[in-house]
């Protein structure tokens, strides 16, 4: 997207925009990623009036929803889009047709905006590190598992294996019976385009994307 000049916005009766995050708490880019990294239990989305300042217009309609423990940034984004379409059909269109725009009062107690300058705050540049806890690694995987269109190296969960950086596509616990090739005293190994990890007496499979960096 891009910033639209105010003189252009003034030519439109109701310039509106959809934002896939709750405003003003999660303005800017990749709101679902930051919400997961910050251990949020809920997220949201909204339609708002547009101004020359990004994500700062009055709220027309909003929806909050739960972030499940298994949700990734991608599935949170999907929920936002589904609720966004529902709000457009049930609220936004009706207000436009009736020429009766009502705004909702914003909660300005927490205002934050995440831009490109914040990308450096992604833990370990998105590299999983199994010297750290399983909870840490799974959260990082979930937060960086976005849609296929977002292919930036930074915004993908990754793992380093024998001096190669590889993007992780899936992260699942598996049965110990399915592991036949683990060497003794080793907690991580590679087999058939997957990294296998032994952690806290459990086994996990990290399926890799074919693209290597």
Identify what each model region corresponds to.
Residues 1-115:
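Donor/substrate-binding cores of folate-linked one-carbon enzymes
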């Amino acid at each position: 997207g891009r910033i639209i000049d105010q003189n252009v916005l003034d030519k439109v009766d109701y310039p509106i925009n959809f934002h896939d995050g709750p405003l003003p708490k999660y303005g800017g880019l990749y709101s679902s990623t930051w919400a997961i990294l910050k251990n949020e239990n809920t997220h949201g989305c909204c339609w708002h009036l547009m101004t020359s300042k990004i994500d700062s217009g009055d709220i027309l309609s909003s929806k909050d929803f739960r972030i499940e423990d298994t949700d990734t940034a991608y599935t949170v984004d999907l929920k936002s889009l589904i609720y966004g379409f529902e709000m457009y059909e049930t609220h936004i269109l009706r207000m436009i047709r009736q020429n009766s725009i009502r705004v909702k009062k914003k909660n300005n107690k927490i205002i934050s905006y995440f831009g490109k300058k914040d990308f450096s705050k992604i833990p370990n540049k998105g590299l999983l590190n199994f010297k750290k806890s399983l909870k840490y690694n799974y959260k990082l995987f979930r937060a960086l598992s976005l849609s296929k269109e977002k292919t930036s190296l930074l915004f993908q969960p990754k793992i380093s294996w024998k001096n190669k950086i590889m993007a992780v596509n899936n992260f699942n616990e598996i049965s110990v019976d399915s592991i036949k090739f683990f060497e003794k005293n080793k907690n991580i190994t590679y087999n058939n385009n997957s990294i296998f990890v032994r952690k806290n007496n459990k086994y996990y499979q990290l399926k890799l994307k074919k693209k290597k960096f």
